[in-house]
Amino acid sequence: MEQKFKKGKDHGVGVLTSGGDSQGMNAAVRSVVRETIRQGHRCYLIREGYNGLINGNIELAKWAHVANVTHLGGSMIGTSRCDEFRTTDGRKKAAAIMFDKRIFHLIVIGGDGSLMGAQKLKEEWGRFGEELFAEGKITEEVANEGRELHLAGIVGSIDNDCIESDKSIGSDTALHRICEAIDGLVMTAQSHQRVFVVEVMGRHCGYLALTAAIAVEADYVFYPEIPPDEKWPEQLCHQLGSVRKMGKRQNVIILGEGVTNSKGQRIDVRQVKEEIETRLQLEVRIATLGHLQRGGAPSFLDRLIGLRMGYEAVQEVLKGKEEKEGAVVTGQKTIAKVMCLRGHNIQRNELSRVIRQTETANEEIMQRHSDLACRLRGFGFLDKQTYLNFVSIPLSTTMPSRTKTFAVVHIGSPCAGMNAATYSFTRMANHSGIQVIGIKHGWDGLKNKDVKLLTWANVQGWAQFGGSMLGTKRQLPSEMDLIAEGLNSNNVDGLVIIGGFMAFESALILQQNRSEYTCLSIPIVVIPATISNNCPGTCMSLGVDTALNEICRQVDNISQNAIGSKNKVMIIETMGSRSGFLATMTALSTGSQFALIRQVETNEKDLEKLAIETKERLDSGNLEKFLLIRSEGASDEIYSPDVKKIFDKVMKNKYGVRITNLGYSQLGGHPSCFDRQMGIRMGVRAFEGIVNPVKMGDRDCCVIGLRGSSLRYVPVQGLGKKVCFEHGVPHNMWWLDLHPLVEAMTKKPQEAVLSS
């Protein structure tokens, strides 16, 4: 069978995965293949990394080759480390194969070593072409056609050591595996009052070690960027002794695999174990997680990043010699780019510069230049060290008798991350000599004086729990006299409201009543926490990541069962109220064929047409199953049973149609690593604003907004003009730009048909 493409000049695009495998690579490969075919070009799967490029292990990709791969870990096309490609002769052999197959556009998915090799190939490409032509191995026509190699890189590495990118493919899933493992270890450690020393991967980058330490409330962490001095055993044992005196029954110590002390001497898990046993006489166990960190299904975030980076990489390599606008050109040669994640945006940065900066950071770490190494890693890396110091180091003094009081209340539906934010806010406040009270069960708790004193000790372990430890309620503040009395009786000097759209509305109501109640003239901060992701002022709310990981797990199971069953059409309903965020992200990350949301109008005729197309694709064998993700608030006229009736009428009992309402299971169990560490970051940021309102600017009633990679204070008053109160959503939603990718990645274009 031969694949035919639409008329016009077509290009050959090669995609390979190289180096260590990482979860999310398959999502990127799928995206590259389908977007290339959608644009009418040839896509080649280069198997086994650079070995396949040298040996000609290359296959023309078809649309169906990348069906049902998004949920799989590892690399579907194989990956390897290739010593031969490090040589000039090896790269020339690879170039000869590429000229032979007319592959002049290459997308490489891998770590810094793999991308460095790709950059070297691009630099030598012109010379290789001239030599191959002179040797008579390629014609003049082929030499002219391939005079330039269009190259794009995608960082696929669990180490997340690439400078200029917030995340690399695989790092988020690796953190999931680490947190899952340590959550399990904590239970057994607590039973026996043991200490666990956990070794994690990361090579010369401490991202995994440091981020995991924050998420699991580790007592101590070793990572390469800050090598400890020779007195580290005393410091470690003092820390463990302090938390034991406060009643903690277990301890977790995380050790990055590339850690040395300030003199360059390797620190290993056995050495840490022996020091603790000798000095504290505690029972210590070692857990080396190893390749477990690379295994399992990809997380939601790695699926989404892989899809988006693959799509952007295709746009980069195919922008063509004809397109000059926006392209960076040196003479006749375009500059290779690497896809980098910044906040929720994908940027295309110069590959050679990113490689140099990554090499520089690694060299500074090897030279043990801590300050410069941490600065090169970015401000977020420095902030994490600060957060860890405050939330893990016990109080050195008792709380003063007279102090300020800050209050925390949870509003709306419970979700993951609420407790993590409360935990970090409480510990930051206690370190500053400020007491914190938790208002139980929403505003009713404040009116009924149902509050609880939160201390450094009694919030221990909260970051690892989902839901709301304080109790939450869907309600807005009413009976303002009782609200004011509750604040006055507890001498509240600052208030944190954790929740979704109702939390934002609550802050707005309190601010509007300040002229009547002086006790409301206190700093107020909203921490957005809702799986609907409809809180204004932020790109992402707490709880979203945990919910989407749970949804992906369930949809994967439903999809698998649909393949081997007569029930080929699955209508899956997600939460989200009037916001279609969950449905859109679910469709993108699970390979679903359609997302039905309020923000994109769909009527009965559209659904009838969709059902007819679906039946035709199922009949032809080009589709194994059809997944339709419907947001619960997608329409007030067409509900899931109505969608089923439309499909049933078209399918005529040939294919079964089933509805699955995921319900409250979407809220998830233990919070994901992202929600834990982001909750802790937001809790710290909330404290910084309340204790020093000048940081919040002219307004002292703000939402903590995740904008790009940073957390900012966004005034509540201004946000009131940017939302639809009727439907409880912001007017502008960044994620709507991604919605067209649902169809682009699943609907095979007519121009790319298979002929027998």
UniProtKB/Swiss-Prot annotation:
PROSITE patterns hit by this protein: PHOSPHOFRUCTOKINASE
Keyword vocabulary terms for this entry: Allosteric enzyme, ATP-binding, Cytoplasm, Glycolysis, Kinase, Magnesium, Metal-binding, Nucleotide-binding, Transferase
EC number: 2.7.1.11
MF terms in GO: 6-phosphofructokinase activity; ATP binding; fructose-6-phosphate binding; metal ion binding
Biological pathway: Carbohydrate degradation; glycolysis; D-glyceraldehyde 3-phosphate and glycerone phosphate from D-glucose: step 3/4
Alphabetical list of Gene3D superfamilies matching this protein: 3.40.50.450, Phosphofructokinase domain
Superkingdom per UniProt: Eukaryota
Annotated control of activity: Allosterically activated by ADP, AMP, or fructose 2,6-bisphosphate, and allosterically inhibited by ATP or citrate.
Region (C-terminal regulatory PFK domain 2): 405-756
Short name of one Pfam family: PFK
Residues the record lists as binding beta-D-fructose 2,6-bisphosphate: 474, 530-534, 575-577, 632, 658, 664-667
Positions of substrate binding: S157, I158, D159, R194, M201, G202, R203, E257, R285, H291, L292, Q293, R294
One of the GO BP terms on file: fructose 1,6-bisphosphate metabolic process
Region (Interdomain linker): 394-404
GO CC annotation terms, alphabetical: 6-phosphofructokinase complex
Function according to Swiss-Prot or TrEMBL: Catalyzes the phosphorylation of D-fructose 6-phosphate to fructose 1,6-bisphosphate by ATP, the first committing step of glycolysis.
Subunit description: Homotetramer.
Record family assignment: Belongs to the phosphofructokinase type A (PFKA) family. ATP-dependent PFK group I subfamily. Eukaryotic two domain clade 'E' sub-subfamily.
Name of this protein: ATP-dependent 6-phosphofructokinase 2
Species whose genome carries this gene: Caenorhabditis elegans
UniProt gene name: pfk-1.2
